[in-house]
Curated annotation (Swiss-Prot):
GO terms for molecular function: proton-transporting ATP synthase activity, rotational mechanism. This is ATP synthase subunit a. Key component of the proton channel; it plays a direct role in the translocation of protons across the membrane. It is found in: Cellular thylakoid membrane. CDD domains: ATP-synt_Fo_a_6. F-type ATPases have 2 components, CF(1) - the catalytic core - and CF(0) - the membrane proton channel. CF(1) has five subunits: alpha(3), beta(3), gamma(1), delta(1), epsilon(1). CF(0) has four main subunits: a, b, b' and c. Keywords: ATP synthesis, CF(0), Hydrogen ion transport, Ion transport, Membrane, Thylakoid, Transmembrane, Transmembrane helix, Transport. Pfam families: ATP-synt_A. One of its GO terms (cellular component) is proton-transporting ATP synthase complex. It is a multi-pass membrane protein. Gene3D superfamilies: ATP synthase, F0 complex, subunit A. The chain crosses the membrane at residues 30-50, 91-111, 128-148, 193-213, 214-234. Disulfide bonds: none annotated.
Length: 241
């Protein structure tokens, strides 16, 4: 009976339609660029306003920004180590803030209500291409961290503590970006789908608590992504004895 009572166009509910940009033979997902530019622009304005008049007794936005700075500093120091964490703080902070504002932007802003000639907007991190690119960037970063700090000795990691570990360590280099990208993509996309279905079925009340849960999940996913990135870098620069 419940199934018969559903709207007849329920099957028309879609995950989303891409806004494509064609550059030569390359087709890009334009909605990722548009929403990323909007969110990054808003973040830059937020930071500019918060740091415009720095005070010894921070209040308001300056207080929030200093809290974020301290949090990212402590995260980097804990995961990477005292020796080189300062070199990687800007990278870890940028990752965290981009993923955070992308996730929250998808949870708070009704992108699909913005009408476009074709396609629709959505959270950048709800696109698998974005999360894979971020994960590959993390992989390149910990390779660079290991080689720049240890030189060719970095590859001793692959046979530590025994050469038997070599194939497993190589496999790990592939599973790290896969787990990073699919964890972030899956959680953000699932949240958008759940909210979309509930808005379709019960548009007034039921989606609100789910949206708050989505905000919490989005923040946790940004924290997990930044923490794992810092941990991988710390693992690469760690001296094995």
């Amino acid at each position: 009976m419940f199934l018969n009572s559903l709207p007849t166009n329920f099957a028309a509910l879609e995950v989303g339609q891409h806004l494509y940009w064609q550059i030569g033979n390359i087709r890009l997902h334009g909605q990722v660029f548009l929403t990323s530019w909007i969110l990054l622009g808003a973040l830059l304005v937020f930071i500019s306003v918060g740091t415009k008049k720095m005070e010894n007794d921070p209040k308001g936005l300056q207080n929030l920004l200093e809290f974020l700075w301290d949090y990212i500093r402590d995260l980097s120091r804990t995961q990477i180590g005292e020796k080189v964490y300062r070199d990687w703080m800007p990278f870890i902070g940028t990752l965290f803030l981009f993923v955070f504002v992308s996730n929250w932007g998808g949870a708070l802003i009704p992108w699909r209500l913005i009408k476009l000639p074709s396609g629709e907007l959505g959270a950048p991190t709800a696109d698998i291409n974005t999360t894979i690119a971020l994960a590959l960037l993390v992989s390149l970063s910990y390779f660079y961290a290991g080689l720049s700090n240890k030189g060719w000795r970095y590859f001793e990691y692959y046979v530590h503590p025994t050469p038997i570990m070599l194939p497993f360590k190589i496999l790990e280099d592939f599973t790290k970006p896969l787990s990073l990208s699919f964890r972030l993509f899956g959680n953000i996309l699932a949240d958008e789908l759940v909210v979309g279905v509930l808005v379709f079925l019960v548009p007034l009340v039921l989606p609100i608590p789910v949206m708050f849960l989505g905000l919490f999940t989005s923040a946790i996913q940004a924290l997990i992504f930044a923490t794992l990135a810092a941990y991988y870098i710390g693992e690469a620069v760690e001296e094995h004895h």
